């Protein structure tokens, strides 16, 4: 005789309110034999089938017209593989029963996930194609410890939450289920009854692909193969390397002219990659490409942290783009957003009816500036989700570096908050200790697991040791954006030259703290939006002076210690602010040769010259690599310094930030001899006035500026020149 199933249990199963489906469904030992139970809505007949022979072993009785079937296979005591022949609407289908498979997640994996120390949680959680007991399908697993019931719904089950309720692994709070026949390319979500009894539909936090907005389903998709970083790519990230970064928003770099639609990943591989290579950049930095619902967030409010956006193509198309960049000798940096996530119902917000990924108190868990939620870094599973994501992009896509967004908002509890709007840490301070530990741990793990890849911090305060090792009290980043340098120098450049003498320190101050961090000098997307104007439009004067100022500024920037970053459009002096809904103004480069061509040629020459001469990059973070020659000539707004490599070779950099040419300008130098002008931002090649020094100048044994030898130069108006000493 079979074990009678309580009517309340059947009702709960059919209503989708039963939390332990494996205790009822599937094959079970009873006093009468092996009993098979199945919930198959809309089925009319069900048989248990012997797979090898196709023989019908037993017919299941319909105990509830809503689809609950049960039947006993007499004289059988040991579990065996079986299939179900199910008649739906007059058609017989042979299926494998999901409830005949045992637990999916190994005990060690479950323990590591609960401890938050699983290096690669994405290998266990999410949707993974698999073969179990000879049956192909997909195993699903999702962390939702407070949900009352979780089901997988998708194209394989008519989005019906009754058909595939999952098993809860109570020790870890993870729900799991293997669904035979579910395959790559099919859409799915998790349907759950949350902690409050509400029905929710959630996309998979670990989905490797997702639908493009406005749709929100996840896609079953295989885990990408690992990508090994080559030695060349590792060297290109090092502190002594020439690093010149072209920052790009893929959706607006260039668009189709007929319909203003985006270029695909593959089209970008064919157009953007060779352009960046031709321009002499060493790295491409991509604004976030994680799936996100709102175009206007530029990707900085992601909902699919493991899924490249489908706006530009498939996951494999994105890998094609990265491969093309690597083949062209370009490293790829990905903007990464572990600081916050949007409030959209389909994603992480109140995932299982509780504040699972975020803090429950809005003073800790809500960003007022962006209407987003803040990760609870103190919850081990949450920090594991994020650390694993960093490793995922590097290992599985070949990303060479991560630029971490909005670090200051993570490490300070009072970031952009008034008194009473934030909660102090356990010691009464303003630092977010859990976020600090998360960042240190992420950088430590990346250093251990993917040596050669690096991280960069956008950190807008003077928090000490952002790019210093953890054992020295630092956060462990390799590089930090120098936002102070950027603000000071742009504030200086926007001044009418007649007033610059009173703000000379805005150009000299940066060197005083230059060696406290490993700096990147950024002219990023943030500087050409929200009414700030374009970089060109911030320059003072008439059109000629605007372009001359910009060229002089770029010459100064590429010579100053620190790695370089330039947002797209700035390389040809786009006059408008950036618009994420439109292409860059490439028409400025159409027709006859003009000032925009001149700036573009200058940036290319700056990149190539900077890369060629080790003195310009080898000792960016060593005081030996820089020395002032003229630092105090405020009245004429002239600054001169040398850059130096490890062998002592020097390059002289001289800037004149007034429109007055300075003839016979004498200054002391360290190394006498013949000096050749290798770059002049006032060259006619760049549409300047072509003032200069006729190629080479010889030093004189005339003391100046405390040095025995000196040079006498013509300093062109609103220009920067670079000189290298010729071999004897």
Curated annotation (Swiss-Prot):
The active site is at 405 (nucleophile), 458 (proton donor). Its EC number is 2.4.1.18. Pathway: Glycan biosynthesis; glycogen biosynthesis. It is an enzyme of class 2 (transferase). PANTHER family: 1,4-ALPHA-GLUCAN-BRANCHING ENZYME. This is 1,4-alpha-glucan branching enzyme GlgB. One of its GO terms (biological process) is glycogen biosynthetic process. The gene is glgB. It comes from Shigella boydii serotype 4 (strain Sb227).
């Amino acid at each position: 005789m079979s074990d009678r199933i309580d009517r309340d249990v059947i009702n709960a199963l059919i209503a989708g309110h039963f939390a332990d489906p494996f205790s009822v469904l599937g094959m079970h030992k009873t006093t009468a034999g092996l009993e098979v139970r199945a919930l198959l809505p809309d089925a009319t007949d069900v048989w248990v089938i012997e797979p090898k022979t196709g023989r019908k072993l037993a017919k299941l009785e319909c105990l509830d017209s809503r689809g609950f079937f049960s039947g006993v296979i007499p004289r059988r005591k040991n579990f065996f593989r079986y299939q179900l022949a199910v008649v739906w609407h007059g058609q017989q289908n042979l299926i494998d029963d999901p409830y005949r498979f045992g637990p999916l997640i190994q005990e060690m994996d479950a323990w590591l996930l609960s401890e938050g120390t699983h290096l690669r949680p994405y290998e266990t959680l999410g949707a993974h194609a698999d073969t179990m007991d000879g049956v192909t399908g997909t195993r699903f697993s999702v962390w939702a410890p407070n949900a009352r019931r979780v089901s997988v719904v998708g194209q394989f089950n008519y989005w019906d939450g009754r058909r595939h309720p999952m098993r809860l692994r109570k020790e870890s709070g993870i729900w799991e289920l293997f669904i035979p026949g579910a395959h790559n390319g099919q859409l799915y979500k998790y349907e759950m009854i949350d902690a409050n009894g509400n029905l929710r539909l959630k996309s998979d936090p670990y989905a490797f692909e997702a639908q493009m907005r406005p749709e929100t389903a996840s896609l079953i998709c295989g885990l990408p193969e690992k990508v090994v970083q080559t030695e060349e790519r590792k060297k290109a990230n090092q502190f002594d390397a020439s690093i010149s970064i072209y920052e790009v928003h893929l959706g607006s770099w260039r668009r189709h002219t007929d319909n203003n639609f985006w270029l695909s990943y593959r089209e970008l591989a064919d157009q953007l990659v060779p352009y960046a290579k031709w321009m002499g950049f060493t790295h491409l930095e991509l604004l976030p490409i994680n799936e996100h619902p709102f175009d206007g967030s530029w990707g900085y409010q992601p909902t699919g942290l493991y899924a490249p956006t489908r706006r530009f193509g498939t996951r494999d198309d994105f890998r094609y783009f990265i491969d093309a960049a690597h083949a062209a000798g370009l490293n790829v940096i990905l903007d990464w957003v572990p600081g916050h996530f949007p409030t959209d119902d389909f994603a992480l917000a109140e995932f299982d009816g509780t504040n699972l990924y975020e803090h429950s108190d809005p003073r800790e868990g809500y960003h007022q500036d962006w209407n987003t939620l803040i990760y609870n870094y103190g919850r081990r599973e949450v920090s594991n989700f994020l650390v694993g994501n960093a490793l995922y992009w590097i290992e599985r896509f070949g990303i060479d570096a991560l630029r971490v967004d909005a670090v200051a908002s993570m490490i300070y509890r009072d970031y952009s908050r008034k008194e009473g709007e934030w909660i102090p840490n356990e010691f009464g301070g303003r630092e977010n200790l859990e976020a600090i530990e998360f960042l240190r741990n992420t950088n430590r793990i990346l250093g251990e697991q993917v040596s050669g890849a690096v991280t960069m911090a956008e950190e807008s305060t003077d928090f000490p040791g952002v790019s210093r090792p953890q054992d020295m009290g630092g956060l462990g980043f390799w590089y930090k954006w120098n936002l102070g340098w950027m603000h000071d120098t742009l504030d200086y450049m926007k001044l009418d030259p007649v007033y610059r003498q009173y703000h000379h320190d805005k150009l000299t101050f940066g060197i005083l703290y230059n060696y406290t961090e490993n700096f990147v000098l950024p002219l990023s997307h943030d500087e050409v939006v929200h009414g700030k104007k374009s970089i060109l439009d911030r320059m003072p004067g008439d059109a000629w002076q605007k372009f001359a100022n910009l060229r002089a500024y770029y010459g100064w920037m590429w010579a100053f210690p620190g790695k370089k970053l330039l947002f797209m459009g700035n390389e040809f002096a786009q006059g408008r602010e950036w618009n994420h809904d439109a292409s860059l103004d490439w028409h400025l480069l159409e027709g006859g040769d003009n000032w925009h061509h001149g700036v573009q040629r200058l940036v290319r020459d700056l990149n190539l010259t900077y890369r060629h001469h080790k003195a310009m990059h080898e000792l960016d973070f060593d005081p030996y690599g820089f020395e002032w020659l003229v630092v105090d000539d405020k009245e004429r707004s002239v600054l001169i310094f040398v850059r130096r490599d490890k062998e002592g070779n020097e390059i002289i950099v001289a800037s004149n930030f007034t429109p007055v040419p300075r003839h016979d300008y004498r200054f002391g130098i360290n190394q006498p001899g013949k000096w050749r002008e290798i770059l002049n931002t006032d060259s006619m090649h760049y549409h300047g006035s072509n003032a200069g020094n006729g190629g080479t100048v010889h030093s004189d044994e005339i003391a100046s500026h405390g040095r025995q030898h000196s040079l006498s130069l013509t300093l062109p108006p609103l220009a920067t020149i670079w000189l290298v000493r010729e071999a004897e």
